[in-house]
Amino acid sequence: MFLNTLKAVFGTKNDREVKKYFKRVTQINALEGKYQNLSDDELKAEFAKFKEQILSGEKNENDILNDVFAIVRETGKRTLNMRHFDVQLIGGMVLHDGKIAEMKTGEGKTLVATLPVVLNAMSGKGVHVVTVNDYLAKRDAEQMSAIYNFLGFSVGVILSSQNSDIEHKQAYDCDITYGTNNEFGFDYLRDNMKFSKVEKVQREHNFVIVDEVDSILIDEARTPLIISGPTNRTLDGYIKANEVAKQMQKGEAVLPPAKPEGDFVVDEKNRNILITEAGIAKAEKLFGVENLYSLDNAILAHQLDQALKAHNLFEKDVHYVLRNNEVIIVDEFTGRLSEGRRFSEGLHQALEAKENVKIQEESQTLADITFQNYFRMYNKLAGMTGTAQTEATEFSQIYSLDVISIPTNIPIKRQDKDDLIYKTQNEKFKAVIEEIKKANAKGQPVLVGTASIERSEVFHNMLVKEKIPHHVLNAKNHEQEALIIQDAGKKGAVTIATNMAGRGVDIKIDDEIRALGGLYIIGTERHESRRIDNQLRGRAGRQGDPGISRFYLSLEDNLLRIFGGDRIKSIMDRLGIEEGESIESRIVTRAVENAQKKVESLHFESRKHLLEYDDVANEQRKTIYRYRNELLDENYDVRAKISQNIAEYSANVMNDYILDESGSNVNFENLKAKILYECSTQISEKDFENLSVIEMQDKLSQILENSYNEKMSRLEIKELRNIERILYLQVLDNAWREHLYQMDILKTGIGLRGYNQKDPLVEYKKESYNLFLELVNRIKFDSIKLLFSVQFNQEEVQNLENKANEENEKLLQSSVEMGASEDNLGEAEFKKVPRNAPCPCGSGKKFKECHGKSGPKQGILA
């Protein structure tokens, strides 16, 4: 009560914020006369002066906001015959300040965006405008380009149907770029798989405006963008490698200078295989290749290595078992079967080849990121939506975004009626159909909102029986739906739509419909989120139009059944509600809203919890991508990095074979074998006599440096640096993919630590950090091994970068991109789905029974 009194006297925080913005609106309005008296050329010249002030650093965007907004308003009048209202100016300022502008349906968010877009595009750093589907991205870019082009800005659009990097790069190089959240995110991931900077398509992440921000940053927060694909190894290679491995003879380790007999030696201590010179020669003959360790045969060499490990280091019924013709890992710590897990780096396929069972193609995560972490990369993030206040806390805590509710230009006249609640769903369905028939009889248009495609089908079938003409929209074809939803306000129209269908398109009505009471919104059940319900209500009553909204519920609805249905049921029983009768009560409506608040709170905590885990991986991702970008820079001193890695490798290897602290006892035989195998370099025990541990490490480093320099001496410096850079990148990428796989495994089982009275998040941070340290060392040491072992001819040297790019392109072409919800699944994505596979929309149905059907259905046409 006291809080309400304070609000009545001083206003809410939102009221005070809006009041501040209104003061500036007055200043902008005062400039309207000045700019409307200028010719087109004079207006453009005036704008160019302000742009030059930004580029020179003489002024910043806030200094010139009033003039720029006034110029954009005048430009809108001249090019589109549309004048920004005062409340739209407020919306523009809210967006420029990096906040969320909550603007009701029909208030012109698309036009509002032009104000901050123009202001922030003046720096030349680019502005991104994000929408939920391709249709809206293309529509908004085309509609607003008249304003942008008049003021000298270029506009690009990113569409999922575009297959060319060239098209995407051209769009990103524009001053203003429109596109979907999925495409922006995937382009970022793909850019961080490129082998040169010029091939990247995105520029700096400067300023982004996210339309329908609640859908993208809240609803899709738990859905990561993932590029996954098969490994680079063909299944045939494992079969060949298995046959070769069976013909190779195991030898015994001997002390140098004697050479081991046989084709390979087993290093059981380090669980490794060392192939002898004789073994290499035999393998090359059996494979029919000239050089097993050339770039072209690197995968084959790896497959042979794994095949030899499978035959000599992994024993059936000890390390794995065969069950139903599948290789299943035996956990080395518990002895239990680890069903669902697979050995990485092709070892599992090698074991399958060994046991002559079906070799399964293993997909791997090539790159991933959540929308939460992608959009937080921007220097400034802003958003627009009709519904954000219910999630204001989450926007503030997760994204540091304040939500400002913008007043409507004309007061809302829509009647939001209390819910009608029935005992059973069948009673509710009948009541909805009767209400549709009443409205339809007088010509009042009705929009029926459903929570699922399945419910849409129920009402579609019932309306067919009643012979009522109608349309059914299931968020399948955005462009076709947009055309249909525009007509949903016409006389006699009945439209059934899932929550997301046709979003972003206004439903307009004429005077005849206004006289009938406007558009009638019928919600067939409450969503778990109040925000989704508000979105449905908001389809009626745009720009001061009349309208009606009402929800029809039943005690069998999931929300009421799980959260609070007992209390409502007891009320209905006390009132003696009979079959077919409903209860309409503000108390009951509030009880439903309280149930929704419970669910919203649970979902918020879940998203927050997931983000805490993803933030750990995100810091690692940023570190790897930052280092990768350094390697792409031609001025980066990769040779210095290699020298540093050689020194660390030398110290690490030497420590493995020093048997006491003084360094007087060294296992030189195994050390020599390791250096010869991994670095193709022979060392002499004499070189290390009477040296301390540190001196021995330095000596080994010096020997390897000299060996490396000699190996590469025939190459020109520029060629050598390019080889080093490309090979280093390949090692980094492969190690990063393996790391993502290990992180997935860790995350899958980390929750079980809670049973041992340990905080899973703390444990996850510890173990992921250890995995990251292993990743860093793997990159350092594997790059050294590859650089020492690889052999190439001049043609391979010249085509190295092209070859790397071709292999990467093949990997991307065979990859699967998994992104956000069904509203973002366009035709291009659905075409890739097999008919009997689960539908990507998450309905649980087969694709052919869901989105695999033909486009939007029509009922009996009038």
Curated annotation (Swiss-Prot):
Residues that, per the record, bind ATP: 88, 106-110, 506
Subcellular location(s) of the protein: Cell inner membrane; Cytoplasm
GO MF term set: ATP binding; metal ion binding; protein-exporting ATPase activity
Keyword Protein transport: yes
Taxonomy, superkingdom: Bacteria
Broad enzyme group: translocase
Substrates-to-products reaction catalysed: ATP + H2O + cellular proteinSide 1 = ADP + phosphate + cellular proteinSide 2
Protein name, entry field: Protein translocase subunit SecA
Gene label: secA
